[in-house]
Every structure is written in structure tokens, then in C-alpha cells.
Amino acid sequence: MYLEQLKEVNPLTICITNNVVKNFTANGLLALGASPAMSECIEDLEDLLKVADALLINIGTLTKESWQLYQEAIKIANKNQVPVVLDPVAAGASRFRLEVSLDLLKNYSISLLTGNGSEIAALIGEKQASKGADGGKVADLESIAVKANQVFDVPVVVTGETDAIAVRGEVRLLQNGSPLMPLVTGTGCLLGAVLAAFIGSSDRSDDLACLTEAMTVYNVAGEIAEKVAKGKGVGSFQVAFLDALSQMKSEMIMDK
């Protein structure tokens, strides 16, 4: 249901994301049926966010200047009631990243927080191994998602071998996906943009259902791509993944 709605709405998804993943993110959104815009100019965003459906803030290539950009962009999005997705990339890897992430969460209206276990654990004060965007293995993603949902009072998606979605104290665990996905730079960052497109094209009446479908669509596309690229390597997997996103239909995830 939500996937078909996304394709019909063609949500304008503003992505202020990191320099490593911009091309992949834009192509992934286009494949799925969304309309990406990668603007980083406040004067431009003043107009774009009047008609946008969602805003992604991904702090991957963080600078002091980009911190100010995030703040101003979120202010404009909040003023125009545009949902904001925050991906606090490598939040546990440095004090500066943690400071920026907490500032955005505590001082602005965020609609969705998404990250891996190490990133979200750092935000709630739990020590976990972190090595940048890849993070470390975290034992209890469910409890981390629930606690972050309670602490920040926003829906939370925590990714890992099992993905956890927490909304208003309710949690859902998902186990789809491919082990090849973490081997392609940008799959986690593209996910944040995909989640933004899904919630931006929904009526927000049931975020848990919407996010569950978004995660399942994304992860099943990874499973399909793995089969197509079997024996070929991660380069072929990346292409197959974009192909799979472009061909996804709701009936393909009915039994997942």
C-alpha cells in the first residue's frame, strides 16, 4: 500500500547527505519512484522546502559549516511542516558528531531517527564499539530502539543483522536483507532517504506500518539483488540492487 502511494505521489525528497553517497542516493530514490533534490543552499531550500515532501539530514561528511546548514534547513522544514529524517552517521565515533546529533534531536523537531546500533546506542549514552558508519555489532537492538524512542520521543529505526523499529513504545523486528548490503558504500545512507520518501508520501497515521513496509521493500530488494549477482561480486550487486528497487511491488513482500 505505502509503496504504491509513494510511486503515485512521487515525493520530493530533499537530501542533505554526505559527499560519498549523493549519486547512489539520488539514483536509488529515482529507482523507487521518488524525486530527489540534493540542494545545500539555504536560499534554494527556502523555496524547495515549501513544496517538498520530506527532508533527510545525513551527517556523514560533517563540518562546522554543515552543522549550521542542518540547523537552518530543519528550521525551514519545521516551519513548512515537512517531515525530517535524521541519520546520525558515526555518532559514536567522535565527540563532535555526538554533539551535533544531540543538538539536532533536542532542539529541533525530528520526525524519524535512523541509524545502526552503535550510532543509536551512542545517542542514548550506551557504550558500544563504533568504527564510523559501519558501526559495531550490538547485541540488543530492540532495547536500544525502544529506549531511543522513549528518550527522544520520535520513531526510531535501528539497523543491524536484525532491524528494529520503535514507534510510540511499540517495537517490530525484521530479519530480511542481504549480507552484501553493508559491503556497498551508501546502502545505509540510501535507506535514510528511502524512509524519508515513504513517510513523506504517507498521511503519518501509522508510522509503524509505513516504516515496516519501507524496511521490508528495501531489504527484499537486497535479497533479490544478491540472487541476481550471485558469484559476480559487490559491483554487480550494487547495479542489481538499483534494478530491484525499480521493480519492487507490494505483492513481492506480502509473505515476508
Swiss-Prot record:
The keyword Nucleotidyltransferase does not apply. It comes from the Bacteria. It is an enzyme of class 2 (transferase). GO terms for molecular function: ATP binding; hydroxyethylthiazole kinase activity; magnesium ion binding. InterPro entries: Hyethyz_kinase, Ribokinase-like. Pathway: Cofactor biosynthesis; thiamine diphosphate biosynthesis; 4-methyl-5-(2-phosphoethyl)-thiazole from 5-(2-hydroxyethyl)-4-methylthiazole: step 1/1. Pfam families: HK (PF02110). The keyword S-adenosyl-L-methionine does not apply. Keywords: ATP-binding, Kinase, Magnesium, Metal-binding, Nucleotide-binding, Thiamine biosynthesis, Transferase. One of its GO terms (biological process) is thiamine biosynthetic process. Its cofactor is Mg(2+). Its EC number is 2.7.1.50. Substrate binds at M38, G186. ATP binds at T114, T159. It catalyses: 5-(2-hydroxyethyl)-4-methylthiazole + ATP = 4-methyl-5-(2-phosphooxyethyl)-thiazole + ADP + H(+). Belongs to the Thz kinase family. Catalyzes the phosphorylation of the hydroxyl group of 4-methyl-5-beta-hydroxyethylthiazole (THZ). This is Hydroxyethylthiazole kinase. The gene is thiM.
